Amino acid sequence: MHKPLRWLITIAFYVSNVILIGYSLSSNGSISEFYLHSVVLIECFSLLGVVTSDCLTPSLSYISSNIFHISDRVSGMTLLALGNALPDITSTYQSMKSGVTSLAIGELFGGIFFLLTVVIGLMGCVATIQFQHDKSIETYTEESFDQNLSYDRSNYILDVGIFTFMLLVSGTFLADGRLYFWECIVMVLTYCCCAVYLIKSYKYPCEINDALEREVEIKKTVLANNHITVPNRFTLTTTSDITSTDDGIRYVRPLGDTQIDEDNAISLDPTRLPSKSLDNISRFNQGIPERRDLIRRRIRGYLRSHYHGWVRMTLQDLLNIWEKQNLFNNTVKSLSLPSDDTHLFTKASLDEEGRPLIRKRMNSLQPKDFYKYLSLRNGENSNALDTAISAPQNEYQTYYNEPTSLFLTVPQKKTSKKSLSCDRIPNLVRSNNIILNDEATRTQESTNALNSISDVIDNSLLQYERDDIILDRTLSLCSTKSRTAWHSFQLYNYLTDVSLEIGFFEFLSLLVTTPVSIILYLSIPSEISQTDHDLPLSYLQNIQLIASPIILNQLITNNFSFWLLILSLVIAILLYFKTRTIPNKFNSDIIFTVAFLLSLACLSKAVHIIVVTLTHWINVFNISETILGLTIFTWGNSIGDLVSNITFVKIGVLEIAIGACFGSPLLYFLFGVGFDGIMIMLGDKTGKIVSGRDSNILMHHIDFKVDKNLINTGVGILIAFLIFTVLIPLNDWKIDKKISIALLTLYIVVTCISVFLEVHQV
């Protein structure tokens, strides 16, 4: 999509919505009211997803690991999982408190049904999921990627078994249309027992080093079993290697038999060396799948180190992956020999005779690094490598002073913070074992300091001076331009950077979430770096901390008091003295604690608006509570899980996606209904919601209507359960397109039946 068209669509989208919203506010028609409420619901659901993944979960992660010192494995299955499920739990509480318990129960049933059918069904459409023994984490070759993913069969059986137990417990308790106090206690205790068991049986790597080491070990096994040689090698040439013959034809010696200098670069005429040029380009083309595979493995390692348990992917990581989606396609573009027709070289990259001028690359292959790329095919190279490593720095810097020509090296560019280093690409002229061992070391050292998927990719790709130099859009869609520092304005990056290319759905998501992201960026304090903490507070962070009492009060009570101004003044004075005495100490603790409180308040406010809007629809349009919970409420709360899990599957991090589909229902239903029911029954002093107050507290109960829509969805969940327990084993223990079609068809049929029953009021 061209830049003017992007700007035109963006401006038209926002201007038209502003006009329609203004018209809806000034008119009283049902259509305008429906449109206005629809916009409010969409933005509130977007707010729930963004604030949960980008604000609440990171703050909970920091608090659990840095303040309470809880391990990632425990926090991932408890605090972080609860934080991720907080929108659903809050929705259930607000619905029960508003007297529309059927809306809450319908949303929970609909959410479970949506995850088990639509989400898993679409996951099976993206890739065939095979349940095999001891295949919990797998790495994939270019040929098989996006086609077959493996998941440990024992983990699948465990997930289905726990889900079955949850289904029996919840179905038994809710079948009579009453939720007793003692049933709520049993639900919460059941969830706690299941969480403890899952924590003890958790087998996936939680540390970045563990994840990357496992990826490398599996890759080594695949290479050894299939006798695959790493194709990502070049035969680099130098001027000292070029010898003349009587015929005037020059020949080239391999890099491993010569000395190297990258201080100067000269041009080679590819027409004079057609066989060598063709061989070099052929080697590069063969190396493209290997480099893509390395990047995907590093992204999977990043995700496994940052997402533990049932946690959604952040909006920023989703946007970064969408921008680099070309990395996950099997179609690999290849290079051809340069010619006048292909325009592979620009005029600036040609010498006086029109031959390609290959220039050195800065900030990547330094003189000392060339020793790492010497071929170890003979003893001379090994001795040279040992001698070079032991030589002083100044000796080998002086040693390389002769002009050098590197046929397929990278054009020179200015040093910048966004320069992408080739050091993260598999080494060019080494054997498989050396490549993999060094790759593991370098990958662990570099990835530990990375803040985002964009950093992972940027540190794994070649960076070129111009977009039309040799490899433009061959490896990825990574932009060569600098990005804005504010993640909230990623839409601006897409509008101004032509090299970025995302799909229509992703573009629409940017348009919808950008206003919400900007509001959250300005309201909730955050740290840009995930690795460097206790940095000096910025002006924006100081303002956010000072204004936090006022924002919290407005989100919770909507009542303004002058005492809030005094409290903000006190906070400003304390921050001033803190800056004078201990400027950086406890900064991260303060930021993440305030961010956690503000995130909770934002969630509560957004859920309240959603419940009020849906309750208004129930009264105006005469729609049952259950059908709204099964459809609108479910779709709004589950769209984040759908996008996140599909993205996990596309990358190959299957264990998080499967765990979220089977673990989230356990969390939403058992803990959500149980905990919310306990809180409602203990807090209802008037008896408007809770019945049976004359008897023992254990017999206090909340009544709700079990209508035909709820029964219909329950039957759909049972059929989905039969698909997972019967059809999948009969289908050779895999979820392919046949199973996916069955699941998606089941959801469509059940939803259509519910809508039919609602319309005809059977």
Curated annotation (Swiss-Prot):
Chain ranges on the Cytoplasmic side, renumbered to this chain: 52-102, 178, 523-554, 611-615, 672-709, 760-762
Extracellular side: 27-30, 124-156, 200-501, 576-589, 637-650, 731-738
Gene Ontology, cellular component aspect: endoplasmic reticulum; fungal-type vacuole membrane; Golgi apparatus; membrane
Transmembrane stretches, start-end: 31-51, 103-123, 157-177, 179-199, 502-522, 555-575, 590-610, 616-636, 651-671, 710-730, 739-759
Record GO terms (molecular function): monoatomic cation transmembrane transporter activity
Annotated signal sequence range: 1-26
Keyword tags: Glycoprotein, Ion transport, Membrane, Signal, Transmembrane, Transmembrane helix, Transport
Subcellular localization(s) per the UniProt record: Membrane
InterPro entries from the UniProt entry: CaCA_antiporter (IPR051359), NaCa_Exmemb (IPR004837), NCX_ion-bd_dom_sf (IPR044880)
General function of this protein: Putative cation exchanger.
Family of this protein: Belongs to the Ca(2+):cation antiporter (CaCA) (TC 2.A.19) family.
The protein's name in its UniProt record: Putative cation exchanger YDL206W
Organism expressing this protein natively: Saccharomyces cerevisiae (strain ATCC 204508 / S288c)
